Amino acid sequence: MGAITRVQAAVCVALYGLAPAAQAQQAPPAAAQPQDQTAGALQEVTVTATRRTQTLEAVPYSMSVVSAEKLAESGVTDLASLASDVPGLSMYQYGARFTEATVPIIRGINATGEPTRGFRAFEQAPVGTYIGNSPVDGYFELDDLKQVEVLRGPQGTLYGAGTLAGALRLIPNSPELNTFAGQIEASGGKLAHSDGTPYAVRGLINIPLGDVLAFRASAKYDYQPGFVNTYGLFARSNNGLSGIPLLANPAAPVTSPAIYQDKPDWNFQKTFTGRASLLWKPADGFTAELAILHAGVQGDGGPQVNPDFPGGVSPLDPATTLPAGGPYREFSQIDQPWSRYTNLASADLTWDVGFATVSSTSSYYTTSGSVLQDNTYSLGGLASGGYLPYYAGVPTNPRFVYDQQFADFAHTFTEEVRLVSKSGPDKTFDYVLGVFYENQTSAGAWTIAVPGTPEYQAAQGCLPNCFFNVTTAPGDVTFQQIDTQRFQDKSVFGELTWHFLPKGQVTVGARHFSQEFTDAQSYDDYNFPTFLPATPHESPASKTVGKVNPSYQYADDQYVYAVWSQGFRRGGANSVPLVGPFAESPLLSTYQPDSTNNYEAGLKGRFSNGLSYTFALFDIKWDKPQISSSLPSGNLAVYNANTAESKGFEFESSGPLFVPNLVYTVSYAYADAHLTSDFSLPANNGAQTGTIVPGLIHGSSGQQMPGSPKSSASVALHYDMAIASDYDLALAANAVYRSAVPMQLTPSLGVTSVQYSSSYEMVNVNATLNHQPWRTTLYVTNLFDRENILVPPTQFNELGNLTNDYLVSIPREVGVRVAYIF
């Protein structure tokens, strides 16, 4: 029986056997329950996804809620690890290094292949991410949160144009009035296959400032050591884009090899996330909360390994011998540092005016980052090595480096004002009305350089500013593309709920928005002289999206619902040359908006003993899916397919099991996202002749969309017991499964066939001892030390297999976390 068949069988057993038994299960006496454990696991969950407080079961569409306790038990620290834990939610698992190039994916609504660049082409993400009520982008750890809400399906009416497939809401803890409390926590452990020590320190404090003010602050520093040993690194003048390789023999500048060095535990990462908030409640019915967040992450390299290189003479330097590849071994010519910084300031005001509540959310966020990549081996492997002589000379420059840097920033201001009516059993109608404004400026630069090549040419007697007799930019830059964008969104939205029966209701909603998008891109290729100045291209859009959502409560806390909802994403322009050896078709100069129509029906409920369940069927029709990729020529562009569809189902259930104080959570999602019609576009074939081949970019009906699995599942168990007076023990385990994931949809530079990840399995366990004011946790992540292949190589068996890089999951970590709570 296959892994997914076993998961499906387990779900069926849970549906058939657990509910009746759980309904008969009696809660143990209160004195036998560990403090705040079992009650917390089974307590009713409330959410604010509809802009009013409701129980999770009463929200008439599919959504998941992950509590702070569950985040800790599952080892979830950021959006990528959250995506591994929640079925139906996925991301390309590149870690924090490629944060700006990877986005959350819900229900398979994504057509963009694995990121080959350090940032997206600035197309909007298909899923909106919010901290509280504020939209945000960038990298931050999930710290001091009340819960995470995963809203599945288009959320165009309440959440706008950035929610083509759904939304993620990260709900932070707010300051508490008249309460002084805090926590200090430290953790440390052992990471398999690493000599480094992972550790983290965090603290939070809540301080009352009189009767109407309260302050809350939290901070966390997290260090993750590397686990990949890297070989063949050059010592350079610096670790930036233009760091010049140092000569092993300065007296022989033409033939001297570089100074080689190896680095154990290369791919480290360190993160800081801090948030401070101030709550003011001068009177009943009015609150104001101001908050700031700062997050920074930096590191070197990534979790890439090369087990295939047989060892031997370097294909680029015959005087140097490299060791064989193997588990947790990698090869790189240079260090590859990266960083990202994110800041968010927000102000939330709420005023109870009697018949309704008026709310305002103002926010301003910035994110900036850079990624340095070594593309030397990839270039050497392209066209069976045909590119290498042009770039590295004959004989090959023994110190040749071909690196690229991606740097970007975005500044975004948003303002939203909402009017939410008071609800109650005597109300026939409820409504939400609002206006929204967004103003974003963003820019990104892609720069390619050959550091050390000008010095090597000078040693050969070459004239200044030449690149094997081809004019280049001053210095070592061979290519640069700069993209500057300005985006404005002005929207009005509303939802009206009619309670046409005592237990029945229907919600209708709409959002009308007017958008202005201006894009100006420059393109400078010094190798094959092509220079395109930045010419602004405007892409205005105006559209109305809708929603119809009937639901009926057929028994106490048991609901059936249906929903039709729409999503929309803006179009834009590409900076691709239309002349020269890498000229592209004018059809690739712009890309069109895409949109989704979601048809969904489901059942949700909760029994008196705490057992809850959700079952949803969905079918999403997707028009003009946007695809961002590296073209066969190496140019970067966004373009459209014709039509696609995602259909499937989701199931979640949690509740007590047969053993007192033992609680289960099981969830499963199936999403068959695929093209529903063929498409093709002309593109440059990359042969440096300016040849545009009809249909070179293409996709076929039935082809699976990239970036997400068809099947994903998770199972978690939580057991509480009192082991002595004032000593409580909590045991938890969770396992996740994901089927193989396709990495791309269309051909790109050096890639002619679709590659797949391996299936993904992961088990985490932990044990927590509570003895107030202390809490001690022993944890193990990746219990069986599985090396899941998250991203396979896109260039196989080239340059002596030096291009065979596999992105793998983090090895097993065993550690202890100690917290003092006051």
Protein language model features and the residues they cover:
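N-terminal Sec signal peptide and the immediately downstream disordered periplasmic leader
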Residues: 1-76, 80-86, 206, 284, ...
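Acidic, small-polar-rich N-terminal luminal/periplasmic segments of exported/outer-membrane proteins
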Residues: 40-177, 601
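Transmembrane beta-barrel wall of Gram-negative outer-membrane proteins
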Residues: 193-300, 343, 410-415, 420-438, ...
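Membrane-embedded beta-barrel scaffold of Gram-negative outer-membrane proteins
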Residues: 202, 346-353, 357-363, 368-375, ...
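Outer-membrane beta-barrel domain signature, strongest for Gram-negative TonB-dependent receptors
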Residues: 256-431, 438-440, 612-614
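Structural signature of Gram-negative outer-membrane beta-barrels, strongest in the C-terminal barrel
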Residues: 279-283, 419-422, 430, 434-438, ...
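Gram-negative outer-membrane beta-barrel transporters
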Residues: 420, 434, 502-503, 612-621, ...
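C-terminal beta-signal and adjacent terminal beta-strands/loops
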Residues: 658-663, 736-746, 768-822
